[in-house]
């Protein structure tokens, strides 16, 4: 086997020209032998050793190439593993971030949907008025709550009364503003008060004259009743009854005579002259 392997590895040997002569070469065996071209064949053991060594060399070369391939593979795997180790935390963090973002987006989407639903429900509840609720459209400064409706009614009543006062006072319709309107009403009431006081003073000054005139009328009415009862009754029905403002100074039971009436008339004229009243002053008002 060793020789066979040797011949396989080294097919061309020194015996090739002897065993396989070419047509171009004509070799003389005797001359060849004489020239001592023949060499001794190598020993079989040496051939086996050489072939075994060469086989071992081939094996070692093959194993070296395999080792190199394995080392390259391990290097590539090691580099890839190193890359994975080097980029592993960042990749893990990136995946964690993406997952967190997805979770946040899902939570936000859920919260947004829930918020929208709650808003829609609130709007629906606001749009649907309760059964016992009275919708009141209020202006600025007016109450709209149910507990303030009584206050609103009270303010409306006050405003109506202010309008009636404004209509009573002349020239107050043109005034704008509650303060100015109240000032106009106060001034008007004060003027009315002064006029009433002045008239009451005039009446107190001429009250005796008015009373005497009333007593004269009563005497005439009594005389007419005594003379003609029918005329007296008709006259009393036609004339209004006068009530004295102040207590009587004379006795009503006494019927005045003609002389007494004349004396009373003269006294009345003298009193009017002394007081300075006349018909124009009596009827004049401020």
Swiss-Prot record:
Taxonomic lineage of the native organism: Eukaryota, Viridiplantae, Streptophyta, Embryophyta, Tracheophyta
Species of origin: Arabidopsis thaliana (Mouse-ear cress)
GO terms classed as biological process: cellular response to cytokinin stimulus; regulation of cell population proliferation; response to gibberellin
Main localization (coarse): nucleus
GO molecular function: DNA binding; DNA-binding transcription factor activity; protein dimerization activity
Gene name for this UniProt entry: BHLH137
Gene Ontology CC: nucleus
Protein name, UniProt field: Transcription factor bHLH137
Keywords: DNA-binding, Nucleus, Transcription, Transcription regulation
Comp. bias intervals (Polar residues): 63-84
Pfam family, one: HLH
Origin superkingdom: Eukaryota
Record-annotated bHLH domain positions: 142-192
Disordered as annotated region, ranges: 63-149
